[in-house]
Swiss-Prot record:
Changing residue 337 to A: 93% loss of phosphorylation. Complete loss of phosphorylation. Residues 1-238, 310-374 are cytoplasmic. Residues 260-288 are extracellular. Changing residue 324 to A: Complete loss of palmitoylation. This is Polyprotein p42. Glycans are attached at residue 270. InterPro entries: CM1, CM2. Palmitoylated. N-glycosylated. The modification Phosphoserine is found at residues 337, 362. One of its GO terms (biological process) is monoatomic ion transmembrane transport.
Amino acid sequence: MAHEILIAETEAFLKNVAPETRTAIISAITGGKSACKSAAKLIKNEHLPLMSGEATTMHIVMRCLYPEIKPWKKASDMLNKATSSLKKSEGRDIRKQMKAAGDFLGVESMMKMRAFRDDQIMEMVEEVYDHPDDYTPDIRIGTITAWLRCKNKKSERYRSNVSESGRTALKIHEVRKASTAMNEIAGITGLGEEALSLQRQTESLAILCNHTFGSNIMRPHLEKAIKGVEGRVGEMGRMAMKWLVVIICFSITSQPASACNLKTCLKLFNNTDAVTVHCFNENQGYMLTLASLGLGIITMLYLLVKIIIELVNGFVLGRWERWCGDIKTTIMPEIDSMEKDIALSRERLDLGEDAPDETDNSPIPFSNDGIFEI
C-alpha cells in the first residue's frame, strides 16, 4: 500500500518533467535495487534533465528506498540547511515519534496532528536519509511519501495563489531598502565597494523576480538568493558596528590626558547660546582617559579572543571549509544550477501542452511481502 502511494506521489511530483524522464525514474524506482542505484548515479551526475530541486528530491527518495545507495553531498547540504534552525530537543522528540509511528499512515497522522513546520518535516526526511538503517522500511517509505504529499499539496496551493510571488517581491523590496541603508553605513566604515556590490545584486534579483513573477519554477533560487543578500546585509551591519566601536575607542584614547582649558573650550565650541559644551577640568580629564583606555583594552581583548576562536575553528575543528561552502552556496547561490534550471524551464515552456504523455500506466508489480518485482 505504502509503495503504491509513494509511486503515485512521485508521479504527481514529476508531472512537469518530460514524459520519458518521468517514465525512466518511475521504472527505476519500481525496478529493484540495481535499477534504482543506476538511476541515482545518473541523477547525481546530472545526466537526466531534472532541475536541482527535483534531482535532490528523487535522490532522497531512492536512498530511502534502498539504503545501499550512497548519500549525495548536495542533498545532505540541502537537508542540513533546511533543519539548521531546529532545536536539539525538538529533533530528539521527532526521532522518538518517528520510531513509534509504525508506517505511512502513522507518519502522516503524526505530521497532521502535531501540525509540523517545514523544518520539522525536513528533520524527519534528514533522519531517514542520513541514518536509513536506524529505521524500518515502513518508516522510511512512509516518511518520504508523506513528505512528497506535503510538497505536492503545497505546489497545488501555490499555483492557485499568486500572493506567494507577491511576498517574494516584498522581500526583494525590503532587501533593496536594506542595501540602500548600507550605503549610509559604508560612508563611515569604508565598506563602499561591498555596499555597491550588494545593491547591484539586489537590482539583479528584482529583475529576475519580475521575469518569474507568478511562477514556481525559480522560487527556490529566488528564496536562496534573497537569504544570501539578507545574510550579507546582516554581516555588513555587524562589521560596521565593530568598526565603529574600534574607531570610537581609538579616537577617545588618542586625546591628551588634560582637557582643554575653559577659555579655549568656550572660544572653539561655545560660540552661540544654542550650543552647550561641558569642559572637563584636569582631574575629570584623567578619569575620562582612564575609562577610555579601559574600554579600549577590553575591546582589544575581545577582538583577540574572537581571533583565537576563529583560528581554533579553522585549524583544529576544520570548519572553514564548511563555512566557505555555505558562503558560496548562500551569497552566490548555485549560479550554474540556476542557469541550467532556467534553460530547462524554457524548454518545458516551449514544449507546452503538445508534449505526448508517455507515462507507463501499467500496474506496478509487487510481491506478497510488498517488495518491488522486475
